[in-house]
Amino acid sequence: MSYFPWLTIIVVLPIFAGSSIFFFPHRGNKVVRWYTICICLLELLLTTYAFCYHFQLDDPLIQLEEDYKWINIFDFHWRLGIDGLSIGPILLTGFITTLATLAARPVTRDSRLFHFLMLAMYSGQIGSFSSRDLLLFFIMWELELIPVYLLLSMWGGKKRLYSATKFILYTAGGSIFLLMGVPGMGLYGSNEPILNFETSANQSYPLALEIIFYFGFLIAYAVKSPIIPLHTWLPDTHGEAHYSTCMLLAGILLKMGAYGLVRINMELLPHAHSIFSPWLMIVGTIQIIYAASTSSGQSNLKKRIAYSSVSHMGFTIIGIGSITDTGLNGAILQIISHGFIGAALFFLAGTSYDRIRLVYLDEMGGIAIPMPKIFTMFSSFSMASLALPGMSGFVAESVVFWGIITSPKYLLMPKILITFVMAIGMILTPIYSLSMSRQMFYGYKLFNVPNSYFLDSGPRELFVSICIFLPVIGIGIYPDFVLSLSVDKVEAILANYFYK
């Protein structure tokens, strides 16, 4: 056992190192950009080293635990720890944030503030995934909201203030329910607040109170995931944000809601989750169909990709609601898989916009000829998004399917119905995905424009795309690379349920 504070260093390094950016002399953006990339790389290497040498995969208990008394008057502790459920999202956060920083090279206005906000968001996300205390989880949950709001409102499109305001209203409104639930759970049955996850997991609540806690937390996570009908902030936000911010939103931010749903609602409130799980299955199924159908009608490229993200997160919701080892493992695999695919699609959409300055699909066409590298990578990730065999999306969705079919909690006919509707959603996915590629890359519209000349993907864009594509293929070929991280923890969570 290592007593070195690995997790504390991993959580605080980005925001503290980012604070020093403001003391840099005004010598252009290059120094700030490379400093930020080096911090992200150092953070990713530290995380990888700590997990490789100090984390036991076959141990479902919390590891690398840290517990320091922070505020005496509230009995508030700085509690950190990781297990098989959090290690995957933490590594995903480090990987995507590093590549998003590299993708942010075109940002030149207020570069120091921009890169500081990315590093502050990094700390908040890592802190959320590694917190072992309800109040600390809430603080980290809120910490990354302010950087996202500023990134949206200062480095976005024409309607950036509208989308940023809509984002903060939705997320802050959801956080109110989280803020009310955290002290309620901590103070129940005791004058002293009990906020650590382990004690809360062993706490029993009256069923009515547990349902109230569950529903309040569910609203907060439904905004972040997002779950319909609390999803409407997402297309507007993605439509206006810079594509490096979109990478962080699609790759990491959406996954925090699903993580909270498993970590707190499913692990700490098992009886309420058993009651709500059929409704999660129904909502997830509707979400797949609704978002896939709506995506086909979007003319804005980034909004179409945003609705595809909503559709794919429906599989995660269904996997969580299945209450089976296979279904929950599939949901976690889908979290990781879509983190890569969603970030890559937004990155490639942004690099295309940098060249052609068009965002509406009906204005595009024919850019496969002048930009074959972007065409190849975008087509590859579109195939991954529609769950082509051999890629991570196919494995994740197949595992979720199998989890539903084998669930003993549900009768045969509801399982067949849900599986059938999900299959329809998977048929709709190629419709919006392939039509998006056709409208962008095929035809001769832009190619025939007089004096048109578009540069293809450069080394930086190609490097980012390949770095994301390799794990998509790797997980598709060998999914145990991710599943082995969570399988023991999933068994421990489901041991509290009557249906397994």
Curated annotation (Swiss-Prot):
One of its GO terms (molecular function) is ubiquinone binding. The keyword DNA damage does not apply. GO terms for biological process: ATP synthesis coupled electron transport; electron transport coupled proton transport. Pfam families: Proton_antipo_M. It catalyses: a plastoquinone + NADH + (n+1) H(+)(in) = a plastoquinol + NAD(+) + n H(+)(out); a plastoquinone + NADPH + (n+1) H(+)(in) = a plastoquinol + NADP(+) + n H(+)(out). It is a multi-pass membrane protein. It is found in: Plastid, Chloroplast thylakoid membrane. One of its GO terms (cellular component) is chloroplast thylakoid membrane. InterPro entries: NADH_Q_OxRdtase_chain4, NADH_Q_OxRdtase_chainM/4, NADH_UbQ_OxRdtase, ND/Mrp_TM. The chain crosses the membrane at residues 4-24, 37-57, 84-104, 111-129, 134-154, 167-187, 208-228, 242-262, 272-292, 305-325, 330-350, 374-396, 416-436, 462-482. Keywords: Chloroplast, Membrane, NAD, NADP, Plastid, Plastoquinone, Quinone, Thylakoid, Translocase, Transmembrane, Transmembrane helix. The keyword NADP applies. Its EC number is 7.1.1.-. It comes from the Eukaryota. Belongs to the complex I subunit 4 family. This is NAD(P)H-quinone oxidoreductase chain 4, chloroplastic.
